């Protein structure tokens, strides 16, 4: 059938379930993709990379023999990845200190690019500051694999947001109040996206998730 298909909620699988939720937001209180400003700090909540590891284990691109809580690596990572973090209360208060945010579904780099394109800015990401799950150390994952999963893995459903440097203390205080881990991982700037590790350009060969 020659019908154009538009939208990001597409899959190669035989079954597709779409759920739509609608609501209202007070004027000026929306966290948008197009509000990042030069010199804003870049933050993420929680940790990154564990869902991506589950995918790699599922496809057998990575093999790990270590068990956690009596579970093989794939079962453990998959089950833990299905527990989606609830950041709603934190996000409701975050609007007082940030105008720009989205959730990380297709990978940090891919979703950050959505912000950069809509806001017409560039960014610097410091790889050594990315928050990694403790399982990476337990499984003794190679550092390059850890970095790749954090940058491109996807499925984290953590918040990626920007905010003026003057708001850092308030943001960290808010994070403490709601027991949410928040990490500052970079800076909004003019130009393009730069990914650095200890000040040196990080080699980029990978892509975030693409629906097709």
Predicted features by range, described:
Residues 37-38, 42-50, 70-79, 130-137:
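Phosphate-binding glycine-rich loops and adjacent basic patches that engage nucleotide phosphates
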Residues 60, 64-76, 138-143:
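Active-site phosphate/oxyanion-binding loops
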């Amino acid at each position: 059938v020659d019908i154009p298909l538009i939208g990001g909620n597409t899959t190669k699988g035989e079954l597709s379930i779409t759920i739509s939720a609608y609501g209202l937001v007070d004027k000026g209180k929306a966290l948008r993709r197009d509000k990042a400003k030069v010199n804003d700090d870049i933050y993420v909540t929680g940790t990154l990379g564990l869902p991506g590891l589950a995918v790699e284990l599922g496809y057998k691109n990575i093999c790990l023999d270590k068990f956690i809580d009596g579970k093989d690596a794939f079962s453990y990572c998959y089950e833990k990845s299905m527990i989606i973090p609830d950041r709603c209360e934190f996000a409701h208060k975050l609007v007082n200190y940030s105008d720009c945010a989205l959730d990380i579904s297709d990978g940090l780099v891919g979703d950050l690019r959505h912000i950069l394109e809509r806001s017409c800015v560039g960014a610097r990401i410091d790889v050594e500051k990315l928050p990694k799950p403790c399982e990476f150390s337990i499984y003794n994952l190679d550092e390059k694999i850890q970095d790749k999963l954090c940058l491109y893995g996807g499925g984290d459903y953590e918040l990626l947001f920007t905010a003026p440097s003057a708001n850092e203390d308030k943001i960290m205080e808010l994070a403490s109040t709601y027991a949410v881990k928040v990490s500052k991982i970079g800076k909004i700037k003019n130009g393009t996206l730069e990914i650095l590790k200890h000040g040196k350009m990080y080699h980029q060969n990978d892509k975030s998730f693409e629906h097709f």
